[in-house]
Amino acid sequence: YNLGFYKEKQDSVDTDSVKITQVFVPVTSFIHTLQVDLNNRKYISYDDAQNQKYFEHNYLGTDSIDKTKRTSIKNTIGIALQEGFNKWAKAGLTAFLSYEYRNFALTDTTNIPGQRIINNYKESSLSIGGELSKKQGKLLHYNILGELAIAGEDAGQFSVEGRGDLNLRLFGDTVRLDVNAFIKNQNPVFYFRHFQSKHYWWDNNDLSKIMRTRLEGKLSLNRWGTQLRAGVENIKNYTYLANASIPVKDSEGNVTGFKNNAAVRQYSGNIQIFTAMLQQKLKVGIFHLDGEVAYQKSSEQDILPLPELSAYGNLYMKFGLAKKVLQIEMGADVRYFSKYYAPDYSPVIGQFYNQNPDDKIEIGAFPIVNVYANLHLKRTRFFIMMYHVNARSEER
């Protein structure tokens, strides 16, 4: 809901006449938002013999269905002083208050074999925040947003985010400089603190808040299709999922396999991440080339593994036929990243986790080439692609 005033605006109709209209100028806005999230996840596994062989734990016995639910209701009220209602209001200012209620339903066991109950974990969080922003004009824009949790499960959690862009005309082109930064002190998500399922189970009540600080800059040259980005980030108390599988040995002590398990880990030190990226788009007639090269470095590769070098290229033709009624785009793209210990995937929780240190596999340093054709005829689109054409025929 907006409060403001009307002012007169003059528009020239003819050389000898002027039209005067009333234009509403908002000064103050009252804000209310309601966000309701309902999430369900069901893990189904009927092969109990395989489960007993593959997993270290089977907490729910022979149950084939494992379910978890999450409900979140968030109310936010605020008041905003609008930007530009007079010549002194160079920026907009907003203050808000948020309350969030969360409920997590997890399956639990009892002392009676085969009996299951639902454990409900209820959390709430009350936070205050503010925003300062400048959206009008062509030269400079910025936005600063801060929020602090003052009560509830997340008390003490805070975040301050800022972004801005400066647009300059240089040699007939627009040069844009973007700067983004944030500092966040956040509570680990609920499922890192508590989780109960058929194969994984943990309660971590001693996890510290995660402190993240990031600074990033981006330079864009519109005419040349060039974009250069670089950023640094520091993470303290990085919290992650790890593959905690245990080895299975034969009578002679040789490892014959692993019993799968997962666990939450928290690294109490600092992890630094540096990222630099170059994006370039070229066009000559109907031929297009889009390229991207990125370099990133993690100070703790065992904790937060990243490929140092990754690249993407897309070479294609784009043209129209039949008076441009049929639009055609066809070409090939290639993806590449250097070798690194990529995370494993766990279907039990639908998440990636760090590889088991006793059974690590390094992947990468091999390009993946795809060819494709994309045809657009009025309201109908046809798309065909052959994936990884450079693989050997028996591996496709």
Which residues make up each language-model segment?
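Exposed, low-structure sequence patches enriched in small/polar residues
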Residues: N2-A49, F55-E56, L60-R396
